[in-house]
Design a protein with these regions (language model features):
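Short, surface-exposed, charge-dense and proline/glycine-enriched linear segments
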Residues: 24-30, 61-73, 131-141
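Conserved structured core elements
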Residues: 2-5, 9, 13, 29, ...
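Conserved RecA-like ASCE ATPase "motif II neighborhood" in helicase/translocase motors
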Residues: 31-96, 219
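An acidic- and aromatic-residue-enriched active-site/binding cleft used to recognize and process polar
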Residues: 3-5, 59-61, 77, 82, ...
Length: 221
């Protein structure tokens, strides 16, 4: 599941390749917009029975919504908003999975706090039985100055410390390449650079108030 067909292909293409190049090839059939999971002894009847399948779902391809499902993989949930219709898609999938004892999984880069995305709603309203993992660099004591101030993503030396923290446990990531891209993006869209590379929850350029300003006016009230 993703906001656009191009985006959903980010996970659908590797899945198709895994099937066609591995032992699952004999157990599944790849179609144009879905993958059929074959039933033992019923290969010829699989399409007619319309049983187990893996579907592509986007904002413009929602024909299967409402069907009972056992799993939904929701890519870049930080881009799911009310205006693009993807919050309705995600919540419908959760209801469908709940009815079948299934699960949904969502992942994303840091979201824009001003958009009230699906990822933001899940994070802020998470129940005890919902697992949420977010490595927030602003909560790491090692990424603060002695006076408690968070590191400045605009400064290369401090930005590198944040990148090392964010990408810890991902040895395949080239931090030099990430640093180059972050530096370039800082020139045109600094808040996006902080969200995408620094994993920080900062508002986009359209924000009418600075982060924390509204809340600080009511601190201690």
């Amino acid at each position: 599941t993703a906001n656009s067909e191009e985006q959903v292909r980010n996970i659908y293409r590797p899945l198709v390749a895994t099937i066609l190049l591995g032992p699952l090839k004999e157990l599944m059939r790849v179609r144009d917009t879905f993958i059929r999971i074959l039933q033992p002894g019923r290969e010829g009847e699989a399409d007619a029975l319309d049983l187990d399948r893996i579907d592509v779902v986007t904002a413009s391809a929602k024909s299967r919504l409402g069907n009972p499902i056992t799993d939904a993989e929701q890519d870049e949930a930080g881009l799911y908003t009310k205006s693009n219709g993807m919050i309705a898609v995600a919540t419908t999938q959760r209801r469908g999975a709940a009815g079948m004892g299934g699960r949904t999984h969502a992942w994303t880069n840091a979201w824009d706090p001003g958009e009230d995305s699906y990822a933001q709603q899940v994070f802020e309203n998470a129940e005890d039985d919902v697992f949420v993992f977010y490595r927030n660099p602003d909560l790491a004591k090692s990424l603060r100055h002695r006076d408690g101030r968070p590191l400045d993503f605009n400064l290369k030396s401090e930005r590198l410390k944040m990148l090392e923290y964010v990408y810890r446990g991902s040895p395949w990531v080239d931090l030099n390449s990430i640093e180059s891209e972050a530096k370039a993006l800082m020139k045109t869209d600094p808040t996006q650079a902080e969200r995408f590379f620094g994993n920080r929850l900062v508002q986009g350029g359209g924000a009418w108030l600075e982060d924390g300003l509204w809340e600080s006016c009511y601190a201690g009230a």
